[in-house]
Each structure stands twice: as C-alpha cells, then as structure tokens.
C-alpha cells in the first residue's frame, strides 16, 4: 500500500531540466510503463482513490482541531490548500484518467462514511484475490508417499 499526499507532491522541488510543458504527460506515460512491467511480472495492482467531499474534509479538520490527540493530523496549510479544491479535483481526475488501465485500474471510493469506505476497499481487495484463482497445490503420488515416509520417520524419533 502506498499513500501519497498531494501537498507533498506539489512542494517537491524538481530539477530544472525535468520541468517542461509535457512533464505530466511524460510522468503519466512512465507510470503506465512501470505498472505494465510490474503486472507482466505477476504483481497485482489496484489503485484506490478515497474521495472525501469538501464538506466532510472540513468536518474532519474541525474535529482534529477540537481534539488535542488528533491535532498532529492537521496542518495550518490545510486551510490554504482547501482554497484550491477545484484545482486538486481537476488534477486528480487528470491523473486517474491518464493512468488507469485494464491491468492496473483505479477505483474511486466515496470516503465520507468510513464504514462504507472500509467495506468497499475490502471488497476490491477480495475480488483481486479471488481473480488470482489460488488453490492448494495437488501432491503427486510420489510426493504423498514421501510425506508418509517422513511422517513415519518423525514418529520413530
């Protein structure tokens, strides 16, 4: 599981030669290429965007500010970043659209109600595991005889 905070990405200082008008197109292409490589190697990728509404984000921020045990989760900069809500939503939409593939799909999960979010994410993971069609390997007759022999030897010692 990887968790990325957008404000950290934005604050990232990029070397000047990397900054071009095509930087995001190039990065999205690289993300798709890396994910394509990983899925060819057998890695299962499921990307989940937890979509918290602006109203719910505000409510959670106020709860954090009222509760001393939760204040560490809040940054004063969060208030400034909320002013750019539309820009963040547009950036998320662009990134998700540009990097979703059959092999590495995005799932956008409503996240205002934590119980529902957890249930939806659990179902996505269960479905991904089911798709692996995992099963206990069948033992050949020779392997079964070897195990039986090993069992007899263990009992004798």
Indicate residue ranges for each PLM-predicted region.
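A glycine- and Lys/Arg-enriched "phosphate-lid" helix/loop adjacent to the NTP-binding pocket
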Residues: 2-28, 38-90, 137-144
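Conserved alpha-helical scaffold flanking the Walker A/P-loop in AAA+ ATPase domains
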Residues: 29-37, 93-96
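Arginine/glycine-rich "motif VI" loop of SF2 helicases in the C-terminal RecA-like domain
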Residues: 37-41, 98-101
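Functionally constrained cores in energy, signaling, and assembly domains
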Residues: 43-46, 57, 95, 118, ...
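NTP-dependent small-molecule kinase module
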Residues: 90, 97-157
